Amino acid sequence: GTARYQTIQNNFSLNNRRFEDELAQTCRKEGVSLLPYSPLGGGVLSGKYNDGQLPDNARFSRYFKLNEKRQLTMAQRFINEKSTESTKRFMAIAADIGMTSVTLATAWSKQHDFVASTIVGATRPEQLDEILAAADVTLSAETLNRINEVSREILYPMG
C-alpha cells in the first residue's frame, strides 16, 4: 500500500486563521497534523509594514514597487487595512506580556493541538532570536482570549 499522509502544509498565522474553521476538525479526526508556514504572515506581524511603511529589501515592498498583477495581488492580500490593524492590536498584547509580536505570533502558532511544528524563516540573526524565544513560551488563557477577541473583531484579515 501507499504511505499514509502524516501532515499537511498550509499558511497559518494570527492574520490567517482559516485553517481552524476549514480543516482543523478533519485533521484531528484523521490524525493528520498541520505543518504551518508563514507564522508571521509574510513578516506583516512583525509590524514592519505598519502605517504604510515599505521597508527596503522586504519582499512585499518589492512586490508593490514592481506593480505586476500577480505580485501586487499577493502583497495586498497580506498587507491591507485589516491586517495592519490586527497587527497593531497583537503588538499591544505582546508588549503587555513582555515579548515581541514575532515571539507572540510564533508561540501562538505552535500552541495548537493540530500543529506538528512550525516552518519559520529569518534573514537576520536577530529575527531568528525573536522566533526561537517562542520555543518555551506557553501563552496564558487570558492572552489567548485577548488574541481571539481581536480575531473576532477583525475577521480574516487576509481575506
Question: What is each residue range found by the language model?
Answer:
Residues 1-149, 154, 158:
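Beta/alpha (TIM)-barrel catalytic core signal, keyed to glycine-rich beta->alpha loops juxtaposed to Asp/Glu
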